[in-house]
Amino acid sequence: VILFNVKEPEQQEKEPEEIQAEVMQNPETMTQTAENIEDKYKVFDTMSEDWGSDDLEGFVFYDLPEQYADKGYFPEKMQIYTRCLCKQNDVPYALVLAIIEYESGYEFDKTGDNGNSKGYMQIYEKWHTDRMQKLNCIDLMNPYQNVKVGIDFLSYLLKKYGTVQDALAAYNYGERGAREHLWNNGVYVYSYNTAIMQRMKEIEEVVGK
């Protein structure tokens, strides 16, 4: 028996306007889309706003740069929480914002390095299991836990190496990697830490130090 494959007629690719029109004509599709978007951001409701007036003193809401506004999301509650952690850990708030911008473009659910680097600060989970356990952070895709781990790591690096540029190199390469690939070769300033330090200065003009 010879079986013949019957080729279906090729469907023409629909124009964006046609797709939008179909969605507008289907209220159920619109509802499902809205629900999916709402579910995605529910994680931001998992943190209580238990900060006081002292924590809010000097706070300036940071509007995301236009190029990150579509995919990025960094709501006021997240900004206040991040700023509070920075103050507690003696880490420059503008530095953390610059790292988040560079690493994830303010996409809290972003993954990189084949899924190993996660969240706002692109934490590579394999190298931070002890830190996560210490901080009781088990989910790096939770934005609050992600920045808590990242800021704690930054605090450690800043205290150990003394400068933002070296702390950033160790954040980027890992301490051993920075030593072997950069410092042992006399390299201390390179594209990664240069870009972030420049953005940190620019962001400081908006949110302060």
Question: Which role fits each region the language model picked out?
Answer:
Residues 47-209:
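Catalytic glycan-binding domains that act on GlcNAc-containing polysaccharides
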Residues 3-81:
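N-terminal export signals and maturation junctions of secreted/periplasmic proteins
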